[in-house]
Every structure is written in structure tokens, then in C-alpha cells.
Swiss-Prot record:
Protein name: Uncharacterized protein CPn_0561/CP_0189/CPj0561/CpB0583
Lineage top rank: taxon: Bacteria
Organism: Chlamydia pneumoniae
Family note: Belongs to the EUO family.
Chain residue ranges for the region called Disordered: 152-178
Amino acid sequence: MACEQHEGCYELEEREEIEDIKDSDTKWVSITQAAKLHNVTRQAIYVAIKQKKLKASKETRWEIDIKDLEEYKRNRYSRKKSLYQGELVFDNGKGCYSINQVAQILGIPVQKVYYATRTGTIRGERKGAAWVIHVSEIERYKNEYLSKQAAKKLKGAEPKEHQAPNFEPPTEIFPESN
């Protein structure tokens, strides 16, 4: 019984300490404080620093800016900052896109893009666990496969008088999103 009460007191003290950190006017926190704030281990914070996912400086001890810590928390699971061997996995500036981005660009279901990559219709490369598809491959797939499928659909829906279809492919395949 005494142990349970002691554990409860410890948790209460820890919560008060976390609230003190949040309420104080300090701009910098230590690895230990950052770990307590985000309910993770010190090792997890250290690994994030080493992987350059969390900015920190070390003069005598590691110090992390509160703003950087909050940004890390917001982008912790974001694939926009995913790194593979030190490089961005989905670097849109270099023309590398994720499966979801390709599906959105082409206006087709995500599963169709996965199927196309598995069958080799769209050539993509694996970076770790992620599929990365280059912009030239997106263009090729759009021109070779999607335009043929659209033509087949229109041909099947065309009346017997053989009227010309009113089909215009999209002029811009990459919507501006930054």
C-alpha cells in the first residue's frame, strides 16, 4: 500500500515539474526536460538530435530550444522530412514523389498506383520502406496508360454515330503545393 502511494506522489511531482517547465520563461531545455515534456526516453531525444530531426546545441550540455522542440513534435511523423542515408526521401524539388502524391497528381486511387508499381507499369525505387517515383515516370505513365484507358472508356461510351469525344487531358499535372 505504501509503495502505491509513493508511486502516486512521484507521478504528481513529475507532472508538477513538467508544468513548471512549460510555465517558466526559459527558452532552452535539457534532454531530460525535453524527454519529460514529450513523455519519451532521453535516448529517443538524443537519437532525434543525431538524426538531425531535432535541432540542439551543445556547449557544456545539450540544450534544445522550446520552439524547435514544438516543431519536432508537430513534424515527428511527417514523411516530408523523412531521410534515407542522409537525403530527403520525397524531395519534390528533385522530382521525387510518394505513392500518395502520385495518386493525388494523377487523380487516381492510391491502390491503383501501388498495383502499377508492383506490376512494373510505373517504375519506382525503394528507399527503405518507401516507394519513390520520379516525375518523368509519372509523365510516362500518364501518357502511355491513363490516356489509353480514357480513350477506351470514351470509345465504349461513344454513340453509334461516332461523334468525336469532348476529352481534354489536364494541362497541369503538378498543382502548386508548398
